[in-house]
């Protein structure tokens, strides 16, 4: 390289001398003097080159962009450095030819040097790292502050973000209130995050999106709660499904439809009847502002079997039903599809029943009379006994052996001369 610089210097600085030196001895002497001067200059350049080290900030002029998408930079020392695209920007798809033009000035930090037998010393430079260093030096936020961040990438452990040129990290556990299985949904998005830890000396910046998300959710809840009231029917979108129910988005806030509130029919798994993204009408059952919970019902917005029952059944109706369950206190009888009423143990028979299972079992067909129906409470009281003939009242003698009313009535129907009380009761009188 020194030889190349000599040739360049001779050709550019002393063209007349190079042309005429063969014609004059004086010119040869002049060349000797200038050669010595140039050697001293080259030595100075080489000495300056030796002084460039890793970590130094250098400024150079863009000479070319090579086939590897690297910016070739001419340094003030007369040497060259290269800035790979990956060290120019975080944008993996950047094309330096679209960003730079020949002659542009580039400031970068030296991250390594490479020695080549032919080319001398070349430096690997990074503009991106210099920008980050400057950003750290000019920090305008502190721990606890909320900042705007750009998500650069999603990795297994969390999100890599850029905050005003400073590289930061949001751990997966701090991305949201609940576990996020796919972090890629945040790539290239702008987020707000709270500064949890900041260590400029080690270029360490830890942030939490969850803390800010919780504040945003609280604000959203307050706004949504102010617009809702218990008993109101609103439209929502199924946001996610679980084994115990479906979460419905009511406009930025989710409410829960418990599996028991999805349908009037029995639902084993919410995914059997609902799909994420479904539009559904829901009735608001409860609003818990303290815990930020909203209880919803889909089935409450639909006409169910009890509505049909109210139309078809009235107190006094006699129906045939099927025994579904037998309990100690009575038997549940299905009188319409999905509609069961209770026959209390006292309403099973005119005879004394200790346990309903003595006379009834699941699957039995029985005749019942409706004693009372309350559709709003989904309750029907039934009776089997009411359909039985009432037995004649048995009048028995008292425990002390006295005559029963039946005996006395029979006596009164007899002629006074037919018999005496002694004839009737014998020695019991």
UniProtKB/Swiss-Prot annotation:
A GO cellular-component term linked to this record: ribonucleoprotein complex
Keywords associated with the record: Repeat, Ribonucleoprotein, Ribosomal protein, RNA-binding
Region entry Disordered, spans: 382-412
InterPro entries, A to Z: NA-bd_OB-fold, Ribos_protein_bS1-like, Ribosomal_protein_S1-like, S1_domain
GO MF terms, alphabetically ordered: mRNA binding; structural constituent of ribosome
SUPFAM superfamilies assigned: Nucleic acid-binding proteins (SSF50249)
Biased segments, Basic and acidic residues type: 382-399
Sequence ranges assigned to domain S1 motif in this UniProt record: 55-128, 144-211, 231-299, 316-385
One biological process term in Gene Ontology: translation
Gene3D superfamilies found in the cross-reference section: Nucleic acid-binding proteins
Domain of life: Bacteria
Biological role: Binds mRNA; thus facilitating recognition of the initiation point. It is needed to translate mRNA with a short Shine-Dalgarno (SD) purine-rich sequence.
Family recorded in the similarity comment: Belongs to the bacterial ribosomal protein bS1 family.
Stated name of the protein: Small ribosomal subunit protein bS1
Lineage: Bacteria, Bacillati, Bacillota, Bacilli, Lactobacillales
């Amino acid at each position: 390289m020194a030889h190349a610089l000599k040739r360049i210097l001779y050709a550019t600085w002393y063209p007349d001398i190079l042309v005429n030196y063969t014609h004059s001895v004086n010119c040869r002497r002049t060349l000797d003097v200038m050669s010595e001067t140039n050697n001293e200059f080259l030595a100075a350049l080489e000495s300056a080159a030796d002084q460039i080290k890793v970590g130094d900030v250098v400024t150079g002029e863009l000479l070319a962009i090579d086939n590897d998408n690297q910016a070739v930079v001419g340094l003030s020392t007369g040497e060259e450095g290269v800035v790979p695209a990956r060290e120019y920007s975080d944008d993996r798809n950047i094309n330096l030819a679209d960003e730079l033009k020949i002659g542009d000035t580039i400031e970068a930090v030296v991250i390594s040097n490479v020695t080549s037998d032919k080319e001398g010393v070349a430096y690997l430079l990074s503009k991106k790292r210099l920008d980050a260093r400057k950003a750290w030096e000019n920090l305008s936020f502190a721990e606890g502050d909320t900042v705007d961040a750009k998500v650069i990438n999603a990795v297994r452990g969390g999100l890599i973000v850029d905050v005003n040129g400073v590289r930061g990290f949001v751990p997966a556990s701090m991305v949201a209130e609940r576990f996020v299985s796919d972090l890629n949904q945040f790539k290239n998005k702008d987020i707000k995050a709270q500064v949890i830890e900041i260590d400029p000396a080690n270029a360490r910046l830890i942030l939490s999106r969850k803390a800010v998300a919780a504040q945003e959710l609280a604000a959203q809840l307050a706004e949504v709660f102010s617009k809702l009231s218990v008993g109101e029917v609103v439209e929502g979108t199924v946001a996610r499904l679980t084994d115990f129910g479906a979460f419905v988005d009511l406009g930025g806030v989710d409410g829960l439809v418990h599996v028991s509130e999805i349908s009037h029919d029995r639902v084993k798994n919410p995914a059997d009847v609902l799909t994420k993204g479904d539009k559904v009408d829901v009735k608001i059952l409860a609003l818990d502002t303290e815990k930020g919970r909203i209880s919803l019902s889909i089935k409450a917005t639909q006409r169910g079997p009890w509505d049909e029952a109210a139309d078809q059944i009235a107190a006094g109706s006699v129906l045939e039903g099927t025994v579904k369950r037998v309990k100690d206190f009575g038997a549940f009888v299905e009188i319409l599809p999905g509609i069961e009423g209770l026959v209390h143990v006292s309403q099973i028979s005119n005879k004394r029943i200790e346990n309903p299972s003595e006379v009834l079992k699941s699957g039995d067909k029985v005749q019942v009379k409706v004693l009372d129906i309350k559709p709003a409470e989904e309750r029907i009281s039934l009776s089997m006994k009411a359909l039985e003939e009432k037995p004649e009242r048995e009048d028995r003698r008292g425990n002390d052996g006295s005559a029963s009313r039946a005996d006395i009535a029979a006596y009164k129907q007899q002629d006074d001369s037919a018999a005496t009380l002694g004839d009737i009761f014998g020695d019991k009188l």
